[in-house]
Structure formats: structure tokens, C-alpha cells
Amino acid sequence: MSDRECDVCGKEFTKKAGLLKHKQRKNPCKAPVRLIEATVHQTLVDAGVPHLEVPTTEFREVSKKFNSSMSKELRKEQGIFFTPKKVRDVLFEKLAECGVNPKVILEPSFGSGEFLLDAKRLYPEATLYGVEKNEELFASTQCPEANLVCCDFLDWKGKADLIIGNPPYFVLKTDHLSAKEKKVFASKNAEAMTGRPNIFILFLYKCLTEHLEEDGYLAFIIPTSLYNCSYYQPMRNYIQKHTTIKYVETLDKPGFYETGQDTMLIVLQKGKRNNDYIFQSASGNIYISPHYKELYDITKGTRTLADLGLGAKTGNVVWNQVKEHLAEEGTLLIYSSNINHSELKIDNLCGKERKQYVKDMKKPTLSGPLILVERGYGNSFSFNSVLVELEEFYAENHINVIYPKTEEAAENLNVVMRSFQDERSQKFVKWFIGNGSISATDLETIIPIF
């Protein structure tokens, strides 16, 4: 080890002064997973206890074999995506930094057992429980030290002081939910979410409310839609009131087996201690972000659309539900693809079935001046907008429409367009949006106007 390398975390510095500052910081570093692994491994060897091998690749063979034998469609349908070692390591490192030493560990959807095997290696004295619904995965998992159950996690009962894993994520069909699940996940006053119920929210809510011991830790890999999706506002409210967020990070896309999903790491401790990683808007809405401090700083002293007398709503035409009205001429229908860097590009359509005009539509038309903003499709988000002064047109549902609530407020549309082109607006959107789209409510009440 060099004289400029930290003897705890292994980080190397170019100057001794940097190392000294690192050691004297308020929150001292702790041993990362690779050092914990080595310590546990050596302890077991010294004691003559059989030990588990430390994996040297991102996925164990059982994960690779199962992934190659299962169709992409089925994996997507059941939300089965295995977690690479480098991602698992980060979660375990963060738990180590928190001083977690669990007695009982639960993985609620253990898949091929990657997390269970890591947990057994890192916490050899802990009791392990694993639940898996898929019978093939259950049969293939090689972790005899764990108490494994093949069942639907929604039916499982038990307690743990550490819950860890990568729960499935896919949209549930409401007609498949039980009466209890509909109350929690599909009702207007849902305790966990509104709108379309996603299985990962169901797992998260059940773990926090039924299984996690007081002061216990939950460490999950879940979609970034938890950051700001309006459907999950109740879940964020619960997290803010009943837990402490210890760590949040957005993951880079590569690593998972074809998930096509932006994901995040989150570590929660049951019990309220502080508001780290929480961004609360002036209207009281709760959001989660690794950039919460930057969001507070950038919005300080700014106004919103609502402050300027402007409102926002979503376009009222779903094009594939009005195919019989699509035409080569008639009333203009503006799609999100028509919005291109503050300009309206007519005939810039995606897909052969779409047409730029509609006929015989009974829906009310829009009339300018209005600002049209691309709402997003749930992937990467581009903050595109255009000022439109046409007298009669429609906007599809992937567009948010900014409108003046009074004649006097119409003058502020130009102020908003200038603000949207400010680089600070792009920064805010990058830090704030986790699900690849922005709601009309967020546009009206949160996006800062510079």
C-alpha cells in the first residue's frame, strides 16, 4: 500500500494532503464490500468452516443459464431481471457504511439467488429467508443455508431487520387484483399509489408496512419512476413520514439483462430521522432525488407557471383511439414528434398509421397563443417546447399544453419560453425527472421560471 492510499477504503490520492483531509472528514469511510468479503472469508478459513466462493463475474452460471433458456417476452412479463455483481456490491457497501449487522435477512423475490448467496457470505451468522414465485427459478437456486419458500410474496408473512433485492417491475392489470390489493393500490385514495398499479410498488409497500422491523433496513433496486411519477405520490409520502432515506443513486443503463428500464438504488431505514434526499415543492408535494440539494438551490427565489397566471393540461387526443377520424386534411393534430427545438415541424410523424389531420372530431379544439411541451414517453426525457399561435388545432396526449388563465397572463408565455431555453431549466429537468416524463401538474406547480 502506498503512503497516499487510505488503509480503510483503499482510495488513492495524488497528494498526502488529500489523504489527510479524507481521513479527517466528518463522516469517516468504512471498508467496502471487497474488504468485508476478504475479512469474512479469512475468518471462516481460520475457523475451518466451509465457505462460499466469492463470485468473480457479474452473474453466476445459474443466472446465465436461466436467462438464456427463458424468452425475453416472458422475462419482461414476469419482471425477471438478474442483478450484476457490481450493483449488488454497491448496495452491500452502503449497508456496511450504515453499520448494518442483521440477524434476519429477507429477499422477497430471490430469482436465481444472487443476493442470498452474497448475504450468506457477508453475514454468515444471519438467518436467511427467500421467497420466489417462479417454480423453475426456485428449483434452480443453490443456497441450502437459506429458508426458501416457493409462493407469491404477497401471501408471505414474517419479519426481518434487513430486506434486500431487486423486486419485479411490471404494470398489473387491475382486474387481477384482490379486493385488498385494489383498496391499497387501485383506489382513488390509495395508500401506496394511484393510477396503474406496478408490482414493484406493491413489494415496496408490503415490505415497509408488514415485514421490516423498526430501525431495520431495506435496500432495493427499483425503477427511477419513484422519483417523481405522480402515480407514486402516496408511496413517497409514506417514505417521507415513516422512514429515513440513507442512500439514493441512479444506475447507469448497462448491466442488467435487457431490462430497458432506468433503475435506481435506494436504502431506507425504518423510523423518521431526517429529510435527506427529499425535495418538497411549495405546494407540498414530495419527491425523491439524489440531487435534492441542487433542486432546492436552483428553485430558490423562482416563480412557477401558477405564479404567472398560467395553467397546464394534457392534450386530449389519443391518436390510436381515433383512427377513424385521421385524415390527409382537416383540423391539425399536433404530435410530440412535431415539436422540434422550439419549432413546429408539420408532417414530422412517427409511424405509418399516423396522419397529421383529423375530421369530424367532437372534442373541443385548442386555440393559441399556447405553449406545447413534450410530455415524454417514459424513457429518456427531452425538454422540447414550442409557442403556437394557431387558431384551431388538437394536441395528442403526449403533449402538455400551457395556457393563460387570463388575457393579461398571455404576455407571460414569452417569459416562459425564454426560461425554458435557459440552461438552468435543462439542469432542473435532468435532476428532477426520473420516469422519463413530466405531468401537467408538475409543469404548472414545480418547474422553475427563471
PLM feature spans:
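Signature of N6-adenine DNA methyltransferases within the class I
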Residues: 76-92, 103, 109-126, 131-145, ...
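Conserved residues in the N-terminal Rossmann fold of short-chain dehydrogenase/reductase
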Residues: 150
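C-terminal recognition-helix end and immediately following basic linker
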Residues: 1-8, 12-36
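S-adenosyl-L-methionine
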Residues: 40-98
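Polybasic, glycine- and aromatic-enriched phosphate-binding surface used to engage nucleic acids
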Residues: 298-450
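Flexible, charged surface loops at secondary-structure boundaries
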Residues: 97-103, 121, 155-159, 325-328, ...
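Glycine- and acidic
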Residues: 72-77, 189-190, 396-403
